[in-house]
């Protein structure tokens, strides 16, 4: 027994010595910067190269002489030129580094510098757009740089923007959103913020809070559109105004009769519970049946996304029927996916459609273009990016399809999946805005000349 204890003690001493020696060697290698030689990292790609190598961000990278090789011709991507598509695919194989929330906080800390960096002063606007302001409700919770790019893409000084961030979002994300709001008189943070849980009434409440604030603004916006941080526009502001005018007061959203698979979402009581996967908390179905909807309302389903007229929004904030239906929906699963789709069918509501009218599918509604895995190759081409919960995160090869499909916005985008697509989309939309405003100005000048000749 004595010999065993001695050997055991000696073995422990050996293990401790080897552990300390290993730690010392790793520290030495790190100090001498030998790690890159022994464990070479993948080549990196900086999504925002000029900013990431500037003093305006928190995590600054050294400049690289190889930056020029990363230039991708967006017209070539649009035309599916093999060389440009190949470049985008090569970039995706690298370690993609985008700006972190702290970087967005840093670059928005000085509003004048930020607006110059992002060239807000170069945004063009027509008289038609000035006379047709649009309101936006942005419900966001992560990736400040994605939200910043979205706002920059849809920003016009005559529009109005409400940002609702999740109360459980990281503090740096909240700081970035607060900084963005401080830099513009027409961007603000919702006066009431929610802790948003997936498929819970809190998601609907977040949009509701923004709608309430937007109505109180002095800006007489014509339509309101809700977006999330993974959305991006497919139309320039000029095009969007033209499309909205053509609605002539009607609303635009998905509204279909519920398939049997979805009826349990609102016929049974759901409770918010802890779950052992992604969302942490989720409304879980119980065995308790719900009563019928108030006022004999017929339930329709759709998506959380809408394009609503000002008259519609004013109506719902002054309707006891809508108030009762909102309360009834609180213990359902994903109420935002039936609430708006149902309201638009209520008789007499501004811009609504009859409950007997045909279904309006997600492809017929132009509010959001989403590519579902199980419809790929049937309703639309295959995804060239990746998938998250059966939804396509688009790749650069889908640029042309996205722009030509006819929708106004699309979901999902992720710069760390494909950074080239969002760059090319932004570039194409800016080109379209400049082109249409130039044509509009020529038309205005021509009409003015005709009137002067008439006089």
UniProtKB/Swiss-Prot annotation:
Lumenal side: 35-455
Record-annotated membrane-spanning stretches: 14-34
Pathway: Protein modification; protein glycosylation
Topology within the bilayer: Single-pass type II membrane protein
GO biological process, one term: kidney morphogenesis
Cytoplasmic compartment segments: 1-13
Gene Ontology MF terms in the entry: beta-1,3-galactosyl-O-glycosyl-glycoprotein beta-1,6-N-acetylglucosaminyltransferase activity
Entry EC no(s): 2.4.1.102
InterPro entries per the UniProt record, alphabetical: Glyco_trans_14 (IPR003406)
GO CC annotation: Golgi membrane
Disulfide bonds: 74-228, 162-383, 183-210, 392-424
Catalytic activity as recorded in UniProt: a 3-O-[beta-D-galactosyl-(1->3)-N-acetyl-alpha-D-galactosaminyl]-L-seryl-[protein] + UDP-N-acetyl-alpha-D-glucosamine = 3-O-{beta-D-galactosyl-(1->3)-[N-acetyl-beta-D-glucosaminyl-(1->6)]-N-acetyl-alpha-D-galactosaminyl}-L-seryl-[protein] + UDP + H(+); a 3-O-[beta-D-galactosyl-(1->3)-N-acetyl-alpha-D-galactosaminyl]-L-threonyl-[protein] + UDP-N-acetyl-alpha-D-glucosamine = a 3-O-{beta-D-galactosyl-(1->3)-[N-acetyl-beta-D-glucosaminyl-(1->6)]-N-acetyl-alpha-D-galactosaminyl}-L-threonyl-[protein] + UDP + H(+)
Glycan attachment positions: 73, 287, 382
Subcellular location: Golgi apparatus membrane
Signal peptide: none
Pfam families given in the database record: Branch
Keywords of this entry: Disulfide bond, Glycoprotein, Glycosyltransferase, Golgi apparatus, Membrane, Signal-anchor, Transferase, Transmembrane, Transmembrane helix
Function of the molecule: Glycosyltransferase that mediates core 2 O-glycan branching, an important step in mucin-type biosynthesis. Does not have core 4 O-glycan or I-branching enzyme activity.
Family membership: Belongs to the glycosyltransferase 14 family.
Name by which UniProt lists this protein: Beta-1,3-galactosyl-O-glycosyl-glycoprotein beta-1,6-N-acetylglucosaminyltransferase 4
Organism annotation: Mus musculus (Mouse)
Recorded name of the encoding gene: Gcnt4
């Amino acid at each position: 027994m004595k010999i065993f204890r001695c050997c055991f003690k000696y073995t422990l001493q050996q293990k401790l010595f080897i552990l300390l020696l290993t730690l010392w060697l790793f520290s030495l290698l790190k100090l001498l910067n030998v790690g890159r030689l022994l464990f070479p990292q993948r080549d990196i790609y900086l999504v925002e190269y000029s900013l990431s190598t500037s003093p305006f961000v928190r995590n600054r990278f050294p400049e690289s002489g190889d930056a020029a090789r990363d230039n991708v011709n967006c017209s070539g991507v649009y035309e599916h030129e093999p060389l440009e598509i190949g470049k985008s695919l090569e970039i995706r194989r690298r370690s993609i580094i985008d700006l972190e929330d702290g970087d967005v906080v840093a670059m928005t800390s000085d509003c004048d510098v930020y607006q110059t960096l992002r060239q807000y002063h170069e945004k063009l606007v027509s008289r038609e757009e000035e006379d047709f302001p649009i309101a936006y409700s942005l419900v966001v919770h992560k990736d400040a740089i994605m939200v910043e790019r979205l706002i920059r893409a849809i920003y016009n000084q005559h529009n109005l923007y409400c940002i609702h961030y999740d109360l459980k979002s990281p503090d740096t994300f909240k700081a970035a959103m607060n900084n963005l709001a401080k830099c513009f008189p027409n961007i603000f943070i919702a006066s009431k913020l929610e802790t948003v849980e997936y498929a819970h009434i809190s998601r609907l409440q977040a949009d509701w809070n923004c709608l309430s604030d937007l109505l109180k603004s002095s800006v007489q916006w014509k339509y309101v559109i809700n977006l999330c941080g993974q959305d991006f526009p497919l139309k320039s502001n000029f095009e969007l105004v033209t499309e909205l005018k053509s609605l002539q007061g009607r609303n635009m959203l998905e509204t279909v009769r519920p398939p049997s698979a979805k009826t349990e979402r609102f016929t049974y009581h759901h409770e918010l519970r802890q779950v052992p996967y992604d969302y942490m908390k989720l409304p879980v179905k119980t065995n308790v049946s719900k009563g019928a909807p108030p006022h004999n309302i017929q339930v329709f389903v759709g998506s959380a996304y809408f394009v609503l007229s000002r008259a519609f929004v004013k109506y719902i904030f002054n309707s006891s029927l809508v108030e009762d239906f909102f309360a009834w929906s609180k213990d359902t699963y994903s109420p935002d996916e039936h609430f708006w789709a149902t309201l638009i069918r209520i008789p007499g509501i501004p811009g609504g459609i009859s409950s007997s009218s045909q279904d309006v599918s997600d492809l017929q509604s132009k509010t959001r273009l989403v590519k579902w895995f199980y419809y790929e190759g049937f309703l639309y081409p295959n995804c060239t990016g990746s998938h998250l919960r059966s939804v396509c995160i688009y790749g650069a090869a889908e640029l042309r399809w996205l722009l030509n499909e006819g929708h106004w916005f699309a979901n999902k985008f992720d710069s760390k999946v494909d950074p080239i697509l969002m760059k090319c989309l932004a570039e194409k939309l800016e080109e379209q805005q400049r082109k249409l405003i130039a044509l509009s100005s020529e038309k205005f000048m021509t009409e003015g000349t005709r009137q002067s000749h008439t006089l």
